[in-house]
Amino acid sequence: MTAQHQATGTAPGANLSAHTPMMQQYLTLKAENPEILLFYRMGDFYELFYDDARKASQLLDISLTKRGQSAGSPIPMAGVPYHAIEGYLAKLVQLGESAAICEQVGDPATSKGPVERKVIRIITPGTVSDEALLSERQDNLIAAVYHDGRRFGYGTMDIGSGRFFINQFEKEETLLAELQRTNPAELLYPESFTFLHHVEGRRGLRRRPEWEFELGTARKLLCQQFGTQDLVGFGVEQSETALCAAGCLMQYVKDTQRTALPHIRSVRLEQPDHAVIMDAATRRNLELTQNLAGGHDNTLSAVLDCTATPMGSRLLKRWIHQPIRDQVILKGRQSTIKELIEQNLYDELGGLLRQVGDVERVLARLALRSARPRDLTRLRQAFAQLPELQRLLAESEHEAVQQLRERASTFPELLDLLERAVMEVPPVLIRDGGVIRDGFNQELDELRDLANGATASLARIEERERLLTGINTLKVGYNKVHGFYIEVSRANSHLVPAHYIRRQTLKNNERYIIDELKKYEDKVLTAQAQALALEKRLYEELLDALLPHLGDLQESAAALAELDVLANLAERAETLDYRCPTLIDEDQILIEAGRHPVVEQVMTDPFIANPINLQRSRRMLIITGPNMGGKSTYMRQTALIVLLAHIGAFVPADSARIGPIDRIFTRIGASDDLASGRSTFMVEMTETANILNNATARSLVLMDEIGRGTSTYDGLSLAWACAEQLASKIGAYTLFATHYFELTRLPELMEGLANVHLDAVEHGDTIAFMHAVQEGAASRSYGLQVAALAGVPKSVIQQARHKLHELESATPVAAGESRPAPVAMAPQSHPVVDELEAVRPDELTPRQALDLLYRLKQML
C-alpha cells in the first residue's frame, strides 16, 4: 500500500499480492465498479470496505468499523444484514446513488481459497425495477443529454415499461423544460458537456465517456436491440444528435442490467409540434403534479388522480405534463369519457381494474428475468379479470371503447398455466421453495413426498426402537444443526444398544444416531435439495413460457392503463361537475362560469365561478383589482381549463369553447435564485424574455405584476412595453394582471385589449373580496385595507392613509412636520345594503341567488 493509501485508508490500485486472498478478490471486483458502492457478500452480511464503507456509513447511518488488516493497514468496514438489503438500497436510490451487489456463486465445500463471487446486479436510480425501490405512481426515468455544438439531443427510457423516447432541439430553455417535464431519476452526460449549470444540483448525475455518444456506435447498438438493419422504420434516422443520446442510454442500461432487454422494442421521436409546449416556469407555477412547496397536495394531479391502477396513475401524469394538439385524439378521448358516463360503466370498470394492478412493471421484471413468485400471482390475478372486463366493454357499441376492448386481449392459456403452476400464496423468493403447485410436475411431487414423508417414516423407526430397547420415552427428532437423532433420557441411557452413536449431550437427555437414520437423513436432505433445484428450473421454464407473449402483454397493459385513465376522468367529471369542452378551429377561448379545479376543492365556501372571453378582437385582458382579490386564481384557472381540454378531459365550467393552442406561458410570482446569483427581478425578466421570444398568436400567456422589482417608472415602462409587444406584435391570448393603473388606458389606445377587474367592497377599515370578474378597470387597489387584514399596526395604517391623501392631493408635507392627525373618513353606508339595493330579484337565477347569498354573508 502506498503512503497515500495508508494515510487515507482507500483501496490501493496496484500490488494486490500484498493483500489477503479475500481482499485481493474484493479489490479486483471493486476495480471493475470503481464509481459505485460495492456490497460484498460475506456470510449473512453485505460488507463494504475502504471509501465505500465511509460513504455508506454517512449515507445509510450505519456503523463504521474495521475488519482486521490487509497489506499492513486496518480495513475500514461497514455492513448490513443480507435480509435487510432492500431497505438500504431503497434509501441509496432515493439519494441518487448506485450500488453493485456481489454474491457468492461458488461452492464453499469445493472452493480452494475464497469462495468465487461476482457482481450479479447493479442498482442505479434510473434503472431499478424492484417493486420495493420504486414509487408506484411515479414514472422512473433514466435520461441522457448530448450537445453537438448546434443542438441538444435528449433521450429518456423507462425500464419499468419499455418506453424509449428521443428528442432534439436548439434552445437551452427547451432543455430546462424537458428536464422539468420528465424529471429523470438519473441523467447521463458526456465529459465535454458545457451546460452543467443547467443540471448541477440534480441527483443521479453520471458523467460518461465521449465514445458512448458516438453516432456510429449508437446506430449499431439500437439496430442490435431492435433486430433491424437500420432505424428508418422508427422515423429517427435523421435525428442524429438525439441518436447520440439514445446510444449512450442503451449502452448504460445494458451494462447495468446484464441481461437481454426484450421489452424495449422500439424508439420514438417526440414531435414538439404535436404537443402544447410548457416551459419549466409554467409547470411549476400551475402546480401540475408538485406544489410550490415541493409536495403533492393541492395539485392538479391530486384532484384528478383517482385511478384504480398505478400504471393508470403514471399515464395520467404523463398526459397532464404533455397536453396534445391533435383534435382527433382529443375528441376521441372526450367521446369515450361521455360513453363511459352515459352507459354508467366507469364505476364497475374501476372495481375490475383495481384487481388488475401494476401489470406494466410486472412485465418489465418478467423481461429482465427478475420477476418474483408473487409477480406471477399478480399476473394470474390480472388475467382472471380480463374476461369480465371484455364482457363489460362489450355492452358499449362505441368505436373507441371497442378498440380498447380489442387491445386489452385475454390470455386463457397463460391463465391456465399460472393457475396450474403457481401456489395460491407463494413465498416472496424462489429460493425459499414452495412456489410450484403440487400436481404440476410428477418428479417434483415425488421428491417432495420423500422430503415431507419423513414424519411417517420417523414414527415407524421410533416405534420399532422403543420395542427393541424397552425405552417407552424414546423419541426420534430433527434439528438443522445436528440433523436426525434418537433422544433418550439420562436415566435410561444405560439401556441404549451398543450400535447407538452419541451425537449430542444435553442436561437431561442424550441424543444418538444409527446407520439407518443417517442414511435416511442423507436421502431426505438430498431430496430437499433436488426438489428446490428442480423447482428453480421449473420456475425459469415458466418465465420462458411467458416471454414469447411479452409484446401482446405489453399492448394489453397499455390499453388497460388508458382505460383506467379514461374511466377515472369520467368519474371525476361526474363527481366534480365538469363539462365537456368544445374544441374549435377558430381563435377563441370562451369559458362560462369557469372554476379553479384545485382551489374549489380546498375552499369551505362555494367557489365564485367566472367567465372569460378571448378572441381575435379581444386577445388581451388587463386585469386590475386588490391583492387577495383573486387575480392569480382567475389567471391560473384559465390556463388549467385550457390544459385539461388538451388532455381530452372535461373541465370545471358550465361550458367552454377552446380554439387551437400551441404553448402555455406563465409569469406568476418569483423569488431570488440564490444558487445562480439572480435576483427576483432578474428571474422575472428572464421568464418574460422567454415569453416575448417564443410566444405566438396561438399561445396562452399569463403575466402577473410585471415590473415590481424595480423603480416605479422603470417597472411601469417595462410593463407597458411588454403589454404592447404581446398585443400588437405577437397577438397571443394574454391575461395581464397589474397594479399599474396607467395600463388601463391601453384599451383606449390599441385594438384587441379590454379591461376587467375583480370586485371588492370596502366598509370602514375592512374590505370584502367578491372574487367576481367585472368588465372595466378597478377604481382602486385597496392596498391599505389588505395591509390591515395582514395585521400591520394601526398606527402604520393611519400614517399611510395620511401619506396617501397627501400624494393624491399632490400637496406633500414638509419634512420634519409633526405627526399628522388622522384623516377623517366620510360616512359610508353598509356594503350589504348597497349590494341589496342594486339587486333585481326577478332577474336572478337560483344559482345566482345562492352565490349572492354567500357573498353577502362574507361581507358581514
From Swiss-Prot:
<dbReference type="InterPro" id="IPR016151">
    <property type="entry name" value="DNA_mismatch_repair_MutS_N"/>
</dbReference>
<dbReference type="GO" id="GO:0006298">
    <property type="term" value="P:mismatch repair"/>
</dbReference>
<dbReference type="InterPro" id="IPR000432">
    <property type="entry name" value="DNA_mismatch_repair_MutS_C"/>
</dbReference>
<dbReference type="InterPro" id="IPR036678">
    <property type="entry name" value="MutS_con_dom_sf"/>
</dbReference>
<dbReference type="GO" id="GO:0030983">
    <property type="term" value="F:mismatched DNA binding"/>
</dbReference>
<dbReference type="InterPro" id="IPR045076">
    <property type="entry name" value="MutS"/>
</dbReference>
<dbReference type="GO" id="GO:0003684">
    <property type="term" value="F:damaged DNA binding"/>
</dbReference>
<protein>
    <recommendedName>
        <fullName>DNA mismatch repair protein MutS</fullName>
    </recommendedName>
</protein>
<keyword id="KW-0227">DNA damage</keyword>
<dbReference type="GO" id="GO:0005524">
    <property type="term" value="F:ATP binding"/>
</dbReference>
<dbReference type="Pfam" id="PF05192">
    <property type="entry name" value="MutS_III"/>
</dbReference>
<dbReference type="GO" id="GO:0140664">
    <property type="term" value="F:ATP-dependent DNA damage sensor activity"/>
</dbReference>
<dbReference type="Pfam" id="PF05190">
    <property type="entry name" value="MutS_IV"/>
</dbReference>
<dbReference type="Pfam" id="PF05188">
    <property type="entry name" value="MutS_II"/>
</dbReference>
<dbReference type="GO" id="GO:0005829">
    <property type="term" value="C:cytosol"/>
</dbReference>
<dbReference type="Pfam" id="PF00488">
    <property type="entry name" value="MutS_V"/>
</dbReference>
<keyword id="KW-0234">DNA repair</keyword>
<keyword id="KW-0547">Nucleotide-binding</keyword>
<comment type="similarity">
    <text>Belongs to the DNA mismatch repair MutS family.</text>
</comment>
<dbReference type="InterPro" id="IPR007696">
    <property type="entry name" value="DNA_mismatch_repair_MutS_core"/>
</dbReference>
<feature type="binding site">
    <location>
        <begin position="625"/>
        <end position="632"/>
    </location>
    <ligand>
        <name>ATP</name>
    </ligand>
</feature>
<keyword id="KW-0238">DNA-binding</keyword>
<dbReference type="Pfam" id="PF01624">
    <property type="entry name" value="MutS_I"/>
</dbReference>
<dbReference type="InterPro" id="IPR027417">
    <property type="entry name" value="P-loop_NTPase"/>
</dbReference>
<dbReference type="InterPro" id="IPR007695">
    <property type="entry name" value="DNA_mismatch_repair_MutS-lik_N"/>
</dbReference>
<comment type="function">
    <text>This protein is involved in the repair of mismatches in DNA. It is possible that it carries out the mismatch recognition step. This protein has a weak ATPase activity.</text>
</comment>
<dbReference type="InterPro" id="IPR036187">
    <property type="entry name" value="DNA_mismatch_repair_MutS_sf"/>
</dbReference>
<dbReference type="InterPro" id="IPR005748">
    <property type="entry name" value="DNA_mismatch_repair_MutS"/>
</dbReference>
<dbReference type="InterPro" id="IPR007861">
    <property type="entry name" value="DNA_mismatch_repair_MutS_clamp"/>
</dbReference>
<keyword id="KW-0067">ATP-binding</keyword>
<dbReference type="InterPro" id="IPR007860">
    <property type="entry name" value="DNA_mmatch_repair_MutS_con_dom"/>
</dbReference>
<dbReference type="InterPro" id="IPR017261">
    <property type="entry name" value="DNA_mismatch_repair_MutS/MSH"/>
</dbReference>
